[in-house]
């Protein structure tokens, strides 16, 4: 598992609310749409606000999002409830935001809420990462575009697997026999 995938799993597990969906051509603006930012369906409103928006009113809040454990955006969560619109969006990513490109269509967007105004964002780009994320949370592609059920307990086997991946990813060279035996003992005892 990649470091990004491991981090995405950990952040989703420890989050208040988490959400995932596939990035569309509308999101990237590459199909000529005038849409701004990532669309969030009404069923995931609690990811953005403590209570759903009220038709006839707009509401918004500013948040900090840490992307890929690397860089931040000062983004805006907005509910458009006036006129004919009735939708939620995440906007304000800055001009050089790397995930609004045509090649990002089909990537998996993950948003995890850490606090009222601090979030983690991840974009998984490979089929293997997406499949592993789905497998970990027992999801399928049809189960995206909604909040992720993080209440499911994690099996001890999955916990060991995650811990092994964390340890393995910290090495650049294969450890020696004595070091490997010590790591195995530590993993078993913890």
What spans do the regions from the language model cover?
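Nuclease-adjacent, charged terminal/linker segments that flank catalytic cores
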Residues: 2-17, 72, 76-79, 85-89, ...
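OB-fold ssDNA-binding interfaces and closely related basic DNA-contact patches used
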Residues: 1-64
């Amino acid at each position: 598992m990649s470091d990004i995938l491991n981090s995405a799993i950990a952040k989703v597990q420890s989050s208040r609310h988490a959400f995932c969906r596939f990035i569309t051509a509308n999101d990237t603006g590459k199909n000529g749409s005038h849409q701004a930012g990532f669309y969030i369906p009404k069923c995931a409103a609690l990811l953005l606000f403590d209570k759903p928006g009220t038709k006839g009113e707009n509401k918004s809040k500013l948040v900090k999002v840490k992307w890929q454990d690397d860089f931040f955006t000062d983004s805006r969560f907005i509910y458009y409830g006036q006129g004919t619109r009735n939708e939620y969006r995440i906007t304000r990513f800055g001009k050089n935001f790397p995930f609004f490109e045509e090649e990002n269509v089909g990537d998996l967007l993950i948003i995890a809420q850490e606090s009222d105004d601090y979030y983690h964002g991840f974009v998984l780009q490979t089929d293997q990462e997406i499949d592993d994320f789905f497998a970990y949370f027992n999801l399928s592609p049809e189960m995206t575009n909604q909040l992720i059920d993080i209440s499911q307990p994690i099996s001890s086997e999955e916990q060991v697997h995650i811990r092994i991946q964390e340890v393995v990813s910290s090495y650049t060279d294969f450890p020696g026999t004595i070091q490997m035996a010590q790591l195995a003992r530590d993993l078993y005892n913890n």
